Amino acid sequence: MENAKMNSLIAQYPLVKDLVALQETTWFNPGTTSLAEGLPYVGLTEQDVQDAHARLSRFAPYLAKAFPETAATGGIIESELVAIPAMQKRLEKEYQQPISGQLLLKKDSHLPISGSIKARGGIYEVLAHAEKLALEAGLLTLEDDYSKLLSPEFKQFFSQYSIAVGSTGNLGLSIGIMSARIGFKVTVHMSADARAWKKAKLRSHGVTVVEYEQDYGVAVEEGRKAAQSDPNCFFIDDENSRTLFLGYSVAGQRLKAQFAEQGRIVDADNPLFVYLPCGVGGGPGGVAFGLKLAFGDHVHCFFAEPTHSPCMLLGVHTGLHDQISVQDIGIDNLTAADGLAVGRASGFVGRAMERLLDGFYTLSDQTMYDMLGWLAQEEGIRLEPSALAGMAGPQRVCASVSYQQMHGFSAEQLRNATHLVWATGGGMVPEEEMEQYLAKGRS
């Protein structure tokens, strides 16, 4: 971006200067609306989410047999919700900032099959595509027991088709493993940020991995191009896919059920704050949409990004969405949070969800490493760096009187609040890689 343009952008949006300086930044969204007002802009409805629920239920018997690790939950891919009181104390001590309410962790980091939040959207979109092909070919009806998809006849049928996706790692892992199990030929286009172990794991499942020296945007674009030349190849578009988004959104009702089981109340007197790591935006956008449908105006969602990859904060704050990238303002998009190393946000998610999100913030790689170490020490839970992005949220919210006033929160409401950090990945990180992460944290 030439200097004159840059200067006028900063004059209009002074916050951009902090982003360019790679400072940890928080922006509370003044444009937040009620669910009733914001919902029409999403272009999807509660019925769409119910359809996704129903599809996952139809596939449950198949998943329970195809992936024995899901048998205990009857083929439903869901994660634990746990309180982390020792981590809450540690954060309060390190940041000298009390966190009112209770701190919880949603362990999508330990979801079966692929060990990340992408086991929601990625697996769902592969299943939706497989179902569509089998229904159209007359090989399946909605009433069937879907475990029949494990038969050689179906393997043979699906082997005529291929799937392609561009990814920094975790989405590729979930789509690659699921597609290969169903019988699709699958190619994952991996950006330079992708971890070697993720590529190796994919190859061990018979997935073709194409590696690029460039970032996420290039990997997606190349994947899209490669798929266009083959009519039997289906490209899963992380930047724009409504199907992926709906796969994530199912988490809302599931979380509501977990809250009910644990006797946790969410209402006007007991607000829920949720902190979601954000890359291109599909995962956190879909989850936030599902949460809004489940808890209405009593849930407040925040997106967390690395200081080197603040694409969604930049896009929503300036209103330019996918028309601007972090590289345009001189930021390098290089971060240890490989799953969040995205320079240009989803145009769909930013525009769909901007009215339903309370805020956006950035944090440095070092902050993520520090918190990764603290969580391992205090709670014995090990995550990958990007999964800690949400952990900085509670103190930002609790420290901001202006945000609390904007939403009219009383001290009592804040005392009754639940702060939920969405842990997005790390359950499958190899031991030696995890030791390297832990060594980088400052205790």
From Swiss-Prot:
InterPro entries (alphabetical): D_Ser_am_lyase (IPR011780), Ser/Thr_Dehydratase (IPR050147), Ser/Thr_deHydtase_PyrdxlP-BS (IPR000634), TrpB-like_PALP (IPR001926), TrpB-like_PALP_sf (IPR036052)
Needed cofactors: pyridoxal 5'-phosphate
Modified residues (N6-(pyridoxal phosphate)lysine): K118
Keyword Lyase found: yes
Assembly notes: Monomer.
Family the entry assigns: Belongs to the serine/threonine dehydratase family. DsdA subfamily.
Protein name: D-serine dehydratase
Organism per entry: Escherichia coli O17:K52:H18 (strain UMN026 / ExPEC)
